[in-house]
């Protein structure tokens, strides 16, 4: 079965560490170093979840979780959070401890292999005047017959120009970066495209690459199931967007390893959002 890949999780292309010896022969083994990788998205008014892994230059599949570190998260208003380890590299705040609003700056600090790892980010403004051209979209169900190697992952994050569509708009006078995430909130939703036995869609949560527009058109092939969908407009910081090739953005095409985290790699960034709902109905 095709490996499932979650949208916008950063798989980092890692380089080799420094070499201490003064003279190197061709037959000397060179052992690359590992580094800590931070994955932290601070959503305004939400609890905190930060994931830590230890990278390996031998490939992303060999990265391992980093457990039981002491992590401090402090806001510019003076509030401090101590995150606790919950397993699989994830550190969480208490459910009652939430990120503050726009303009609040956060500093993350931890110690890894004797070095202080530090990162700073600011929560951006919430999107304003988010509107949709319709609260519903009617899509005919499609029965896909036979074998087709293109069945897996049907639909796309960028959308096509055929079939029903709806438009989103918002204020963006300063050309800030936005992305839209599409999430079905229904329980056991019915598929729009019925696939042959043994085939599975590899991604039921869609996300549009970051852009600086004040509008977006969503097409029927960007929805995989019927039911109520949350259309989440994300306001993104430029430090996150800069990690990607914006002309062909995916979770796998970082041009260079991130360098905004002192003594570490990864992403630590503030996010703000607004949400609309749309019902996807069968024709």
Range-by-range predicted roles:
Residues 1-33:
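Bacterial Sec-dependent N-terminal signal peptides
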Residues 22-283:
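A sequence/structural signal for flexible, mid-protein segments enriched
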């Amino acid at each position: 079965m095709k490996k499932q890949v979650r949208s916008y999780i950063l798989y980092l292309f890692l380089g080799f560490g420094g070499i201490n010896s003064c003279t190197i022969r061709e037959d000397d083994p060179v052992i690359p170093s590992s580094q800590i990788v931070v994955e932290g998205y601070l959503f305004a008014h939400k609890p905190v979840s930060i994931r830590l892994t230890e990278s390996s230059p031998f490939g992303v599949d060999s990265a391992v979780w980093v457990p039981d570190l002491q992590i401090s998260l402090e806001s510019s208003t003076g509030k401090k959070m101590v995150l606790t380890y919950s397993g699989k590299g994830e550190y969480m705040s208490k459910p009652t401890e939430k990120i503050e609003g726009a303009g609040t700056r956060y500093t993350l600090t931890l110690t890894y292999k004797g070095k202080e790892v530090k990162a700073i980010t600011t929560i951006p403004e919430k999107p304003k005047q988010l509107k949709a051209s319709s609260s519903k979209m009617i899509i005919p169900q499609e029965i896909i017959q036979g074998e087709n190697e293109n069945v897996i992952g049907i639909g796309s994050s960028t959308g096509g120009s055929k079939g029903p569509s709806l438009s989103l708009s918002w204020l963006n006078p300063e050309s800030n970066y936005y992305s839209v995430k599409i999430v079905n909130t229904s329980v056991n939703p019915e598929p729009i495209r019925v696939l042959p036995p043994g085939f599975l869609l590899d991604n039921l949560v869609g996300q549009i690459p970051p852009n600086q527009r004040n509008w977006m058109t969503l097409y029927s092939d960007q929805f995989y199931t019927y039911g109520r969908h949350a259309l989440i407009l994300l306001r993104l910081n430029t430090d996150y967007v800069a990690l990607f090739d914006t002309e062909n953005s995916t979770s796998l095409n970082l041009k260079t390893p991130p360098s905004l985290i002192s003594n570490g790699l990864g992403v630590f960034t503030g996010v703000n959002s607004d949400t609309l709902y749309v019902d996807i109905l069968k024709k």
